[in-house]
């Protein structure tokens, strides 16, 4: 018995102690004839006396329970606990719980007691459906959900500074605006400077920016670096805006967690996560011969419309701009070190008042088919054509010469004006130098001739 009491004390702690359910003072034999009449309408149900002989109404929560042979036991689910010299029935859990009747109960035991009572009146049983208050739920800082949901912590921190960008064009015949495309961006200054991809804002008449709180603004293009695919736009807002700061992409490690956030298909703050495959995927590996930039490769999904959104580390710092999805599990981001350089150069350009530039624009995003990239694509894409070279079209932007000519995502440009294409840089040069381009593209196992004329636009 001494060991039993010691175990009880160690389990429950002082000064409270669980009482034994049987023991000293009980008769050797039960004599039912000595029991009082069986109880009826017990709100907490029936139970036997501590000696297990006569039936009595069970003690409800906070009611006194027995130390002696003639004292009642607690109702099912309750424990008889001595605390400060008084023994009462207590619920093992004192956390509130929400019932199926929409009411909040102080404990699960209280809900169960009420359920028994209403069932006795022919009403449906009340079941627990949620921990905590019906209106607020339960917030437990020590639960795994709060302790280990680091991705949610990052998203909560950065989401207010991520914006949705909607792009409009004018229909010449009807003389009215229609939505043309959408993308993402993030605020980098309290007075409204926003970073995004250059291809997001190219060839559009008007930009509308929507913040996570639903407020909308017209935006103005401030600066564009087409080669780096970075653009700076600006909105005019009242008051200071939340901003995101740049991290150092050079410090990224393969295997590090990253979070991509944006607004694909106009869905605000869509979040994907992944790891860094490499922080230094050279542009030349992607077939961008004129590129001196190393891209961040990640398996975080970057969908259409996610372009221009931030890729952040677990500290909530921007380590890249989401820019390119080749296929599932292979996406690329412009590193923050390149963004930092663009911002400095843009500041200098604005200070010196450099004017706008003109360029030819086709409306595709592409990459060269190196041997390594061919192998990756054949593993990822079913029925990938048996090509050894060419420019692989990753994306065709809406309302562009490329779309109007019939180019599609997944097409491979294999020749222009009769000359074999071996890299995306050759296509870029042809766009700059030639007028109408006579292309042959491979779609599946079919070679298709397509004629497309680039459009000249201002930046």
Curated annotation (Swiss-Prot):
Gene Ontology CC, one term: extracellular region
Family: Belongs to the peptidase S1C family.
Pfam families referenced in this protein's UniProt entry, alphabetically: IGFBP, Kazal_2, PDZ_2, Trypsin_2
Keyword set includes Protease: yes
Protein name stated in the entry: Serine protease HTRA1
CDD domains from the UniProt entry: cpPDZ_HtrA-like, KAZAL_FS
UniProt cross-references to SMART domains, sorted A to Z: IB, KAZAL, PDZ
Domain IGFBP N-terminal: 22-92
Chain ranges of the Kazal-like domain: 74-136
Extent of the signal sequence: 1-18
EC number(s) given by UniProt: 3.4.21.-
Gene3D superfamilies per the UniProt record, alphabetical: 2.30.42.10, 2.40.10.120, 3.30.60.30, 4.10.40.20
GO MF terms held by the record: growth factor binding; serine-type endopeptidase activity
Taxonomic placement: Eukaryota, Metazoa, Chordata, Craniata, Vertebrata
Oligomer status and interactors: Forms homotrimers. In the presence of substrate, may form higher-order multimers in a PDZ-independent manner.
Record-marked site positions (Involved in trimer stabilization): 148, 150, 257
UniProt keyword Coiled coil present: no
PDZ domain location: 344-446
Xref: InterPro entries: Growth_fac_rcpt_cys_sf, IGFBP-like, Kazal_dom, Kazal_dom_sf, PDZ, PDZ_sf, Peptidase_S1_PA, Peptidase_S1C
Family matches, as PROSITE patterns: IGFBP_N_2, KAZAL_2, PDZ
Function: Serine protease with a variety of targets, including extracellular matrix proteins and proteoglycans such as biglycan, syndecan-4 and glypican-4. Through cleavage of proteoglycans, may release soluble FGF-glycosaminoglycan complexes that promote the range and intensity of FGF signals in the extracellular space. Consequently, facilitates inductive processes in the developing embryo, such as posteriorization, mesoderm induction and neuronal differentiation. Regulates the availability of insulin-like growth factors (IGFs) by cleaving IGF-binding proteins.
Catalytic center residues: 199, 229, 307
């Amino acid at each position: 018995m001494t060991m039993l009491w010691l175990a009880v004390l160690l389990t429950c702690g002082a000064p409270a102690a669980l009482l034994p359910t049987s023991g000293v003072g009980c008769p050797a034999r039960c004599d039912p004839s000595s029991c009082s009449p069986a109880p009826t309408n017990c709100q907490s149900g029936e139970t036997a006396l501590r000696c297990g002989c006569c039936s009595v109404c069970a003690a409800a929560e906070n009611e006194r329970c027995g130390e002696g042979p003639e004292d009642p036991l607690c109702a099912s689910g309750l424990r008889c606990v001595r605390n400060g010299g008084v023994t009462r029935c207590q619920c093992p859990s004192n956390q509130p719980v929400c019932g199926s009747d929409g009411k909040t109960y102080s404990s699960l035991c209280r809900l169960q007691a009420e359920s028994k009572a209403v069932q006795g009146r022919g009403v449906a049983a009340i079941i627990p459906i949620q921990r905590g208050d019906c209106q607020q739920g339960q917030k437990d800082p020590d639960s795994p959900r709060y302790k280990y949901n680091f991705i949610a912590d990052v998203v909560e921190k950065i989401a207010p500074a991520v914006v949705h960008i909607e792009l409009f064009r004018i229909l010449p015949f009807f003389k009215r605006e229609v939505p043309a495309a959408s993308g993402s961006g993030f605020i980098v200054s309290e007075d409204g400077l926003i970073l995004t991809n250059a291809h997001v804002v190219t060839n559009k008449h008007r930009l509308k920016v929507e913040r996570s709180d639903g407020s909308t603004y017209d935006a103005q293009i401030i600066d564009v670096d087409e080669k780096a695919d970075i653009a700076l736009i600006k909105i005019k807002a009242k008051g200071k805006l939340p901003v995101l700061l740049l991290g150092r992409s050079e410090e990224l490690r393969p295997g590090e967690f990253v979070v991509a956030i944006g607004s694909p298909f106009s869905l605000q703050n869509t979040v994907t996560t992944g790891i860094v495959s490499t922080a230094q995927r050279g542009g030349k590996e992607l077939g961008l011969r004129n590129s001196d930039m190393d891209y961040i490769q990640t398996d975080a999904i970057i969908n259409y419309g996610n372009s221009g959104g931030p890729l952040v580390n677990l500290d909530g710092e921007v380590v890249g701009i989401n820019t390119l999805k080749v296929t599932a599990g292979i996406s690329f981001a412009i590193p923050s070190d390149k963004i930092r350089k663009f911002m400095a150069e843009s500041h200098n350009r604005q200070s010196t008042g450099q004017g706008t530039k003109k360029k030819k624009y086709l409306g595709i995003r592409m990459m060269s088919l190196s041997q390594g990239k061919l192998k990756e694509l054949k593993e990822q894409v079913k029925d990938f054509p048996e090509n050894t070279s060419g420019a692989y079209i990753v994306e065709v932007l809406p309302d562009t010469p490329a779309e109007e000519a019939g180019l599609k995502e997944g097409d491979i440009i294999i020749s222009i004006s009769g000359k074999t294409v071996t890299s995306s840089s050759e296509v870029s040069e042809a766009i700059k130098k030639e007028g109408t381009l006579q292309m042959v593209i491979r779609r599946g196992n079919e070679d298709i001739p397509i004629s497309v004329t680039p459009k000249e636009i201002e930046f």
